[in-house]
Structures are given as C-alpha cells and as structure tokens.
Amino acid sequence: MTLTAKDYYYHQLNKEQKKVYYAVKEGLLKMEESFQVLKLSSRELTDIYFMVRMDCPEIFYSVKFTYRYYPDSTMVELIPEYLFTRDKIKEHRLAMKSRVKKLALLAEKLSEKEKELFIHDFIVKNVKYDKLKKEYSHEIIGALGNGVAVCEGMAKAVKILCDELGIWCIVALSDANPDKGIKYRHAWNVIRIDGKYYHLDVTFETHYHGMMLSVMIM
C-alpha cells in the first residue's frame, strides 16, 4: 500500500468524519467565526480539528474551539478560537507564505537528500525549544516567525518546507500516557527520501547539539 502524504490524516477517517474534516478545513481557511458540522462525539471533533492542523501547517492561527449543539439536530455549530485578529491572520499568512517560498528557493535545485539536510540544518540552527510553551510555539509561526517552538511547531515547519519542496512528509505523533509518566504527545516527522521512509526528529536534535536522528523504516 502506498502511503499518501497529502491529507494523510484525512485518509484515516470514515465517511462522516471526512465530511467534518473538510468542513473544519474550509471554515478555518476562510477564517469563519463559526460553521456547521455533522454532530459527532466531542472526542471525534477534537481529534479531527487536530488532524486538520497536522495535515495543513498553514492553518497556524487556531488551536482550539468550542461548539453548540441542539438535541434534535444532526449538526453542531463549531466556533474556532483564533490566536489573532482577522487582519493579523491575513498579515501573518502572507509573511509565512513568503518565508516558506524564500527558504524553498534556496534548495529547489538540490537532490531529495540534500533538500532534507537543508531543512534539517535550518531548523536545528535557527529554532530553539520554547520551554514556556506559548500557544504559537505549536505552530509554524513560532518556528519560522519567532525562532522558538515545541516539538509540534518544529515538525509542522519541517512538513510545510518539505511540502513546498515536493518531499513526501507527514507529522507523526505519539500518544500521551499519564500512567507511565508521559504527560504530552510528542511530534516528529516521517519523510520519504529516494523511495525509503525515515523518522526525523529535529526536536531531539535541537537538544543534542544538532546530532542528526534519521532512522530508516524497514
């Protein structure tokens, strides 16, 4: 089976969940104050909202939502919480798009392996781990705009640069496990270079002086 990087998490969903995914994606891209989606469980809605943001790092301006529902309706009203005003979102989107394109231009003529090394080196040298864990540090605007990010923000920055350079890449996630002392999810990347799949964890590397962690998936 061939893995698909574009809308990777979308393809993990069932038919009804895909409809919600699409509605969330469109609503966030249009920066709507609220929009209607199929009534699913709170857990499903939360997971889908998260999946949209994993597949689409360019949606960096909303990390959570609330919703209203009515007992006799098959729909719920989903209300995104935005990190910035509408005008600021437009401004930041243009800035991030320009930033990504300028960086990609520096590597567009390189081989796949060289492109991956370029992205790796850029993140390791220019992004610091944000111990304060600000909300924007989970997004590309933290990594590419402010030079600080947590694992999620770094992994999304890697993905959006890989997407721009035509490299297969997804954001991979581990589960939280409080019973074993694992309080938070960890995010890294799975990439495909010359037909082979690798794990790439730039967060690990920023803590270990740029030591590369790129492990082939057998």
PLM regions and their residue ranges:
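Intrinsically disordered, low-complexity coil segments
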Residues: K102-L106, G145-N146, D175-Y184
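Hydrophobic/aromatic-rich core segments of domains that either
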Residues: G153-M218
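Conserved active-site-adjacent core of cysteine acyl-enzyme catalytic domains
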Residues: E135, E139-G145, A149, G153-I160
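Catalytic cysteine-centered active-site loop
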Residues: D130-K133, S137, V148, C169-K180
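Linear, non-domain "peripheral" regions
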Residues: M1-S98
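Short, well-ordered strand-loop elements centered on a beta-strand within folded domains, enriched
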Residues: V76-L78, G142, N146-V148, K196-V202
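Secondary-structure boundary elements
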Residues: R86-L144
